[in-house]
């Protein structure tokens, strides 16, 4: 697949061909990418922080991969699945399903673009069910907010970015300081 990329955008991340940047946040950049093996589009979050080779970095790498593996086992219709995770040039990345045409709920948090109350109740219900499912499997999202909830073109809801999830009762997660959005 011949991808047109912006200057400064990587051509590839792991085995995935980068198509274009989708968004940029405080912890990383999300790219629409293509998986050549499965022939499907994916979203890749490439984290800004680089990882060294000292003991703390090795532990952080182990935690990241363990958490990605746990979150990757979540299978719920309202949670965007993780397909893969890895590290390239000292930067970690997570590969998820790309939900074509979806918008984050942030787009509906301003006057003039508010959703009808019955739709808001439905969204909250679906989010609560998805979070309950994750919690029942020992995974806590820790950063649920409008920009981490997608509204699909058909009106369904998908929670994204378990990037700072806490895996409860696990030796791969630890909680130090503050996590999530203010």
Predicted regions span which residues?
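Conserved ATP-binding/catalytic core of the eukaryotic-like protein kinase fold
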Residues: 2-182
């Amino acid at each position: 697949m011949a991808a047109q990329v912006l200057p400064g955008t990587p051509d590839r991340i792991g085995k995935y061909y980068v198509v274009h940047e989708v968004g940029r946040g405080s912890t990383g950049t999300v790219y629409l990418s293509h998986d050549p093996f499965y022939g499907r589009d994916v979203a890749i979050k490439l984290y800004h922080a680089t990882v060294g080779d000292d003991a703390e970095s090795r532990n952080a790498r182990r935690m990241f991969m363990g958490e990605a593996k746990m979150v990757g086992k979540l299978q719920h219709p309202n949670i965007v699945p993780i397909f893969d995770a890895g590290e390239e040039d000292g930067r970690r990345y997570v590969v998820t399903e790309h939900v074509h045409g979806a918008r984050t709920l942030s787009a509906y948090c301003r006057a003039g673009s508010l959703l009808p109350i019955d739709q808001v109740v439905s969204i909250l219900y679906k989010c609560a069910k998805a979070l309950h499912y994750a919690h029942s499997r020992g995974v806590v999202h820790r950063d649920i907010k409008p920009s981490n909830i997608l509204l699909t073109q058909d009106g369904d809801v998908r929670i994204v970015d378990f990037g700072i999830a806490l895996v409860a009762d696990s030796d791969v997660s630890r909680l130090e300081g503050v996590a999530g959005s203010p």
